[in-house]
Amino acid sequence: MKIERDERRFDFHDIGLAIKRAREASGMTQEQLAYIVDRAPRTIMYNENDGQHPSFNTFYQMVTMFDISVDQYFYPSQNSGRDRKSVV
């Protein structure tokens, strides 16, 4: 059984903005977040502002740290009834 490959690339920009808003709301700088997730501050800047895709591990660390539900970004047509923060 062959799995069809979807060639669309996920637009990370909205999640990046959600991470930025959550980081700012917590009073954390890009430099502090970069230190915590072991990345360069410019990498955090690119993730937040330019929609650059982080590694899965970095992505997971950031969304769990700020309690960001990603369902609304991956499944925009579905309403997830979860009690997690909606930052955007």
Q: Which functions belong to the PLM regions below?
A:
Residues 14, 25, 51-54, 65:
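Helix-turn-helix/winged-helix DNA-binding modules
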Residues 37-54:
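Recognition helix of helix-turn-helix/homeodomain-like DNA-binding domains
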Residues 57-72:
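DNA major-groove recognition helix of helix-turn-helix/homeodomain DNA-binding modules
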Residues 1-25:
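A short, Lys/Arg-rich alpha-helix, primarily the initiator
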Residues 17-32, 36, 61:
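Short basic helix-loop element that most often maps to the first helix and adjoining turn
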Residues 1-4, 74-88:
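Short, charged recognition helix plus adjacent turn
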